[in-house]
Amino acid sequence: MAEITASLVKELRERTGAGMMECKKALVEANGDIELAIDNMRKSGQAKAAKKAGRVAAEGVIVARIANGFGVLVEMNCETDFVAKDAGFLGLANEVADFAAANKGTEIEALAAQFEEKRAALVAKIGENMTIRRVQYLDDARASYLHGAKIGVLVAGQGGDEELFKKVAMHVAASRPEYVNPTDVPADVVEHERNIQVDIAMQSGKPREIAEKMVEGRMRKFTGEVSLTGQPFVMDPSQSVGDFLKAAGATVSGFIRFEVGEGIEKVEEDFAAEVAKITGGNA
């Protein structure tokens, strides 16, 4: 049986909002598989739709550029928020973004190699590790949005103006859509959610035909919630983003959203334990 660690229980609690004992029991029954535990908890009514994995734990900045008909987002990481505000660190991050904007398609390995000497010199000067973590390009980018340099968004599309696409980019930053349109949600994702909703509906005790209608309604809601055009517009929740775009004669063809440290979990060591280790346990 897989080890059920405290950090695994903590993550399940954060993603489902369920109690500690319920989370531990679900993980034991799922043999430590957190995604299976979430599915089982949803089917049993212990949890609603879970938050996506990807706790933000690393520090750093997101830098955006739009040039020559395309956009680029770059993430550069460091260890502390203090260094994330350092002029030298910010200068290097912006230099990397400028290079990527001038050399479309440069992949992360080549980008890291290009700036390795400068990165190493800055590490030696500041005394803290830093990495150029990722880069992504978007054709037909119309607007970018940075939220405190911690979240970066690019939006591509046709019609409308820069102000319109800037508003859409702000929405993407706030609402975290995963797809552009409800029809873009992959078939396997739809099928996975449908299976969960069928189990939930059948447990209601209602006739099958009613249960099936319930599932169809919930699936429309699900695909709307995870897609940009199906979400309520953050600046005017009375209309969807799709309605907002349609009224302006505009369409979105794609977007990219970066958040500093997505998917990275920084190990937080207990301060007392660290002191004890340094002093040989004679604190």
Curated annotation (Swiss-Prot):
Pfam families: EF_TS. Keywords: Cytoplasm, Elongation factor, Protein biosynthesis. SUPFAM superfamilies: Elongation factor Ts (EF-Ts), dimerisation domain (SSF54713), UBA-like (SSF46934). One of its GO terms (cellular component) is cytoplasm. Coiled coil: none annotated. Associates with the EF-Tu.GDP complex and induces the exchange of GDP to GTP. It remains bound to the aminoacyl-tRNA.EF-Tu.GTP complex up to the GTP hydrolysis stage on the ribosome. It is found in: Cytoplasm. NCBIfam families: tsf. GO terms for molecular function: translation elongation factor activity. It comes from Actinobacillus succinogenes (strain ATCC 55618 / DSM 22257 / CCUG 43843 / 130Z). Its main location: cytoplasm. This is Elongation factor Ts. Residues 80-83 are annotated as: Involved in Mg(2+) ion dislocation from EF-Tu. Belongs to the EF-Ts family. It comes from the Bacteria.
